Amino acid sequence: MKIINAVFYKSVSALTGLPEETFPEIVFVGRSNVGKSSLLNSLTGVKGLAKTSSTPGKTRLINYFQINGNIYFVDLPGYGYAAVGHAEKAHWGNLLVSYIEKRRAIALVLVLVDSRHPAMASDREMMAFLEYLDRPYGIIMTKDDKLTQKERAAARREMESFSAKAKFIVNYSSFSGKGKAELLAHFEHYTC
């Protein structure tokens, strides 16, 4: 898949605000501060398209980005640690679960996992949830540039042991772009 055009479309705080299900949706999900927004910016080549922050919990809404006029990339709030109150975190959790359960337009879910901390309990729970719903998902091991080759291989083996039903696993660096071509090639199978 080649990305020619990427624009912010809309943000929603409730399922009632979601756009019509006219385009396939590729969903970015993962723990807070795993690099969902950075990955989105890297893939599209549009710096600042998705807001990034070193503070966990920056993404607080479901953010839609229209890609090539006929696909949505959907950036979801992170799960796990975030610098917000319990009530807001509970709202995010309910929103995330309801969206993934009910949205028919979801073509693929990308589960982003920090390469330095693969297979955390919250990531395994997300994969189990997606498998229960029979949602196709791929795993993106982010922050790949922060590992040595030996650490990268060990993290990959560990991730593979927990993700037998993942359609693919891609090691990705938003900093260098490593993994970008491979990931975009996978999208071809889910956006036709």
From Swiss-Prot:
Q: Which Gene3D superfamilies match?
A: P-loop containing nucleotide triphosphate hydrolases
| Pfam families found in the cross-reference section | MMR_HSR1
What are the GO cellular component annotations?
Answer: cytosol
List, for all copies, the residue spans of the domain called EngB-type G. 22-192
Keywords, A to Z, come to:
Cell cycle, Cell division, GTP-binding, Magnesium, Metal-binding, Nucleotide-binding, Septation
Q: Which residues bind GTP?
A: 30-37, 57-61, 75-78, 142-145, 172-174
Keyword hit for Cell cycle: yes
GO biological process terms, semicolon-separated: division septum assembly
What InterPro entries does the record tag this protein with?
G_ENGB_dom (IPR030393), GTP-bd (IPR006073), GTP-bd_ribosome_bio_YsxC (IPR019987), P-loop_NTPase (IPR027417)
* Function text: Necessary for normal cell division and for the maintenance of normal septation.
Similarity remark: Belongs to the TRAFAC class TrmE-Era-EngA-EngB-Septin-like GTPase superfamily. EngB GTPase family.
Q: This chain belongs to which protein, by name? A: Probable GTP-binding protein EngB
